[in-house]
Amino acid sequence: MAPCKPGSNPPKGRVSAAEGGARREATRRPPREAAAKRWCFTLNNPTEEEIKSLETWLVSDFHYAIVGKEVGEQGTPHLQGFVHLKQKKRLPQLKQLFKRAHWEKARGSDEDNEKYCSKEGNVLLTLGIPAKGNRSDLSEAVAAVKAGRAMTEVARDFSEIYVKYGRGLRDLKLLIGQQPRDFKTEVIVITGPPGCGKSRWAADYPGSKFYKMKGEWWDGYDHQEVVIIDDFYGWLPFCELLRVTDRYPHKVPVKGAFVEFTSRVIIVTSNSPPDAWYSEERCCVQALFRRINKWLVWNHDKFEDAPDCMKKYPINY
């Protein structure tokens, strides 16, 4: 077949280069919008269900987030929000937070957006810390420590900074970190025969956990919500156990320093009841019993509250 002459029509069934290019251009998918960490949104006429969903937002997902409730010039109530995510996300992923909201990539600094979203004073949510201008990673790590974040989180979010300045960040935490305890730590005792599931019950309890090993040191303690003292038979000094199970400020030793004890819950598992842990000739076991808030015992196939006949002294008073 002879080639087409310039200006002539292509053979039947063939498409000219120009026409093919036009078709490809028409059917080409629009480019995907680039992912970003910083977004702002507006949600008009928010429902109670949508407002309540803010309670499910996790601080671990954000460097900073703020949501304010406002009324527009036309009288339309709306939510005005800004998020600075830890991981870049595209618009479809953000729709999982608020499907009906109008989302745009944010302009200005975190502080600018903080002021804008809180201008009417009705702030429904704040998470994290707003980054200031062109703040360095070290400055952000320091701000995280000052805000009371756990050192494990600081190390995870600022790994390179932690490798370089970990000792300084830890020293800063010790100097200005956690506030002393001003609440009663809840004490849960679980007793029963070997293999009944005491350790599993403790491991399944919600919250971050620190397992206290036998010995003086609390190395690795970083203000976890729950402290587990597993398979206990009295190997902590009696006076130390009384202090950590109380409501007053107390510091525990780590190598080279002391840190505030601020855990909300202590779970003690043992094969023996609390009155068998220490000699009553030397220790006032009644003082320990009064600090116990809940005592569970194994009863054939489940854990139940210990009956009064097992309690040598009253608990939780």
UniProtKB/Swiss-Prot annotation:
Name of the protein: Replication-associated protein
Native source organism of the sequence: Pigeon circovirus (PiCV)
Short sequence motif RCR-2: positions: 78-80
Primary location class: host cell
Cofactor info, note text: Divalent metal cations, possibly Mg(2+) or Mn(2+).
Record: residues binding ATP: G192, P193, P194, G195, C196, G197, K198, S199
Gene3D superfamilies: 3.40.1310.20
Family as reported in the entry's similarity comment: Belongs to the nanoviruses/circoviruses replication-associated protein family.
Pfam families: RNA_helicase (PF00910), Viral_Rep (PF02407)
Subcellular location: Host nucleus
